[in-house]
From Swiss-Prot:
GO CC annotation: cytosol
Disulphide bridges, residue numbers: none
Protein name, UniProt field: UPF0434 protein Maqu_1739
Family affiliation: Belongs to the UPF0434 family.
InterPro entries, alphabetized: Trm112-like
Length: 62
């Protein structure tokens, strides 16, 4: 994902910062403990499509 695009995106729930996961398949909001999928290169920024981070993922902030 383009760094400029990532810098413009915000969590749709809290408007906080998003981080790209190591596999580059999800955008992570650590504040809300949510992971938004990236499908075919397009971020799916819908809370209903997000998954909740596991406890280990919450502790493994980058």
């Amino acid at each position: 994902m383009d760094k400029k695009l990532l810098a413009m995106l915000a969590c749709p729930v809290c408007k906080g910062e998003l981080k790209l996961n190591d596999a580059r398949t999800e955008l992570i909001c650590y504040q809300d403990a949510m992971a938004f999928p990236i499908r075919e290169g397009i971020p799916v920024m819908l809370a209903v499509e997000a998954r909740t981070l596991s406890t280990d993922e919450r502790l493994d902030k980058h």
